[in-house]
Curated annotation (Swiss-Prot):
<keyword id="KW-0150">Chloroplast</keyword>
<dbReference type="GO" id="GO:0016041">
    <property type="term" value="F:glutamate synthase (ferredoxin) activity"/>
</dbReference>
<keyword id="KW-0560">Oxidoreductase</keyword>
<dbReference type="GO" id="GO:0051538">
    <property type="term" value="F:3 iron, 4 sulfur cluster binding"/>
</dbReference>
<comment type="pathway">
    <text>Energy metabolism; nitrogen metabolism.</text>
</comment>
<dbReference type="Pfam" id="PF00310">
    <property type="entry name" value="GATase_2"/>
</dbReference>
<dbReference type="InterPro" id="IPR050711">
    <property type="entry name" value="ET-N_metabolism_enzyme"/>
</dbReference>
<feature type="domain" description="Glutamine amidotransferase type-2">
    <location>
        <begin position="1"/>
        <end position="400"/>
    </location>
</feature>
<comment type="similarity">
    <text>Belongs to the glutamate synthase family.</text>
</comment>
<feature type="active site" description="For GATase activity">
    <location>
        <position position="1"/>
    </location>
</feature>
<dbReference type="GO" id="GO:0046872">
    <property type="term" value="F:metal ion binding"/>
</dbReference>
<keyword id="KW-0274">FAD</keyword>
<keyword id="KW-0315">Glutamine amidotransferase</keyword>
<protein>
    <recommendedName>
        <fullName>Ferredoxin-dependent glutamate synthase</fullName>
        <ecNumber>1.4.7.1</ecNumber>
    </recommendedName>
</protein>
<keyword id="KW-0314">Glutamate biosynthesis</keyword>
<keyword id="KW-0934">Plastid</keyword>
<dbReference type="InterPro" id="IPR029055">
    <property type="entry name" value="Ntn_hydrolases_N"/>
</dbReference>
């Protein structure tokens, strides 16, 4: 796969960010796969901040008031092809939102150009709509995201017995981020979704992904980015990870869910791809109160034992990994992961280090990460920092502060937030080896 992101350190939404991401994505075509028609891509997609100017413009044309941005969730939804099934699915979605006390503001048909899609993509293409909902009962931004997460889980549960259940899929449902994706080649994603050509589509960041399908056959929902992650690689431990997630479902609790943990289960889906299940696990940790960097460190730890730098300079990072090693098995395999919750954008490489990732920062306040260099035209004189991710390394961009943190800075901040070393000393019990 080919992945990358563009981020504006001033956190100013702009169309240029989206345009640069699409340019870079187009240069990643050789990293993806195509179907037998040589035109239907394994998948291509883009995650960004929500383009409120674009949606407010649509709302005004529809006679709607401008959206209350802090309390409005936007869902990018794949719906059944059959017209009657689509209406049933829409009604089921609306019922869950209404029952949860959310106000459904309307549905927006997503404009597209079908002529650039391949034959296989056209035959399997879902109806693509966006739903807008208002969340009045919550004021905290994280609680709003949790409410939308619960709603999506309830929708999945309410529709699982429907004949069209496999055709209903939320690419995203958030008040911060949105995802445009499909069974497309990278160079035509921006031509297919007409929104991506509109200069009102503005975002301070964009994650892009071109898929090469390995473990699962191409389908519209399996294009990436997923709801939190863009993944280049495979998770070779997926069966064990799913089994352990399932075994812990009954005991996982957090006060942030206010006793609603049962509504979140199941946490994994054996029918989904390895990337989708890793995304599910990351999203669960994020919505439970973890930061994106903390979630990535728990899921994809580096090879920390006998690490010369960590042992001497950052023992608190080793304490973090030791604390969580018995609570979360590593999702292992070649993996370059790009991630965002709309406030932080980042990338990390798993401990195998078998996927390329380059990054660079420019004097005009932009940070770029990509599977390879040369995907965006660049004035070299503007580059003030550059490097590559090695095994187990990470880089993050805080969009709200403009701070860029490289590897050990990220991990030190996460590991220093809690007294993991003290907890280990107080709670660890050694068991004598037993002869078998």
């Amino acid at each position: 796969c080919g992945v990358g992101f563009v981020a504006n350190l001033s956190n100013e939404p702009s169309f240029n960010v989206v345009r640069d991401a699409l340019t870079a994505l187009g240069c990643m075509e050789h990293r993806g796969g195509c179907g037998a028609d040589n035109d239907s891509g394994d998948g291509a997609g883009l995650m960004s901040g929500i383009p409120w100017d674009l949606f407010d413009d649509w709302a005004s044309k529809e006679g709607l008031v401008p959206f209350e941005r802090t309390h409005t969730g936007v869902g990018m939804v794949f719906l059944p092809q059959n017209e009657n099934s689509m209406e049933e699915a829409k009604a089921a979605v609306e019922k869950v939102f209404t029952d949860e006390g959310l106000e459904v503001l309307g549905w927006r048909p997503v404009p597209f150009n079908l002529s650039v899609a391949g034959r296989n993509a056209k035959e399997t293409m879902p109806n693509i709509l966006q739903i807008f909902v208002r969340i009045a009962k919550e004021d905290d931004a994280d609680d709003i995201e949790r409410e939308l997460y619960i709603c999506r889980k309830l929708i999945e549960r309410a529709t699982k017995s429907a004949s069209w259940a496999d055709e209903l899929y939320f690419c995203s449902l958030s008040s911060r981020t949105i995802i445009y994706k499909g069974m497309l080649r990278s160079e035509v994603l921006g031509q297919f979704y007409l929104d991506l050509q509109n200069e009102l589509y503005k975002s301070p960041f964009a994650i892009y992904h071109r898929r090469f399908s390995t473990n699962t056959s191409p389908r519209w929902p399996l294009a990436q980015p997923m709801r939190l992650l863009g993944h280049n690689g495979e998770i070779n431990t997926i069966q064990g990870n799913l089994n352990w997630m399932r075994s812990r479902e009954a005991t996982i609790q957090s006060p942030v869910w206010r006793g609603r943990e049962n509504e979140l289960r199941p946490f994994g889906d054996p029918k989904a791809s390895d990337s989708a299940n890793l995304d599910n696990a990351a999203e669960l940790l994020l919505r439970s109160g973890r930061s994106p960097a903390e979630a990535m460190m728990m899921l994809v730890p580096e090879a920390y034992k006998n690490h010369p730098t960590l042992s001497v300079k950052y023992p608190e990072v080793i304490d973090f990994y030791e604390y969580y090693k018995g609570q979360m098995e590593a999702w292992d395999g070649p993996a370059l992961l790009l991630f965002s919750d709309g406030r932080t954008v980042g990338a990390c490489l798993d401990r195998n280090g078998l996927r390329p990732a380059r990054y660079w920062k420019t004097s005009d306040g932009f940070v770029y990460v990509a599977s390879e260099v040369g995907v965006i035209p660049m004035d070299e004189s503007k580059v003030v920092m550059k490097g590559r991710l090695g095994p187990g390394m990470m880089i993050t961009v805080d969009l709200e502060t403009g701070q860029v943190l490289e590897n050990t800075e990220v991990k030190k901040n996460v590991a220093s937030a809690k007294p993991y070393g003290t907890w280990l000393q107080e709670s660890t019990r050694s068991i004598k080896p037993v002869n078998f």
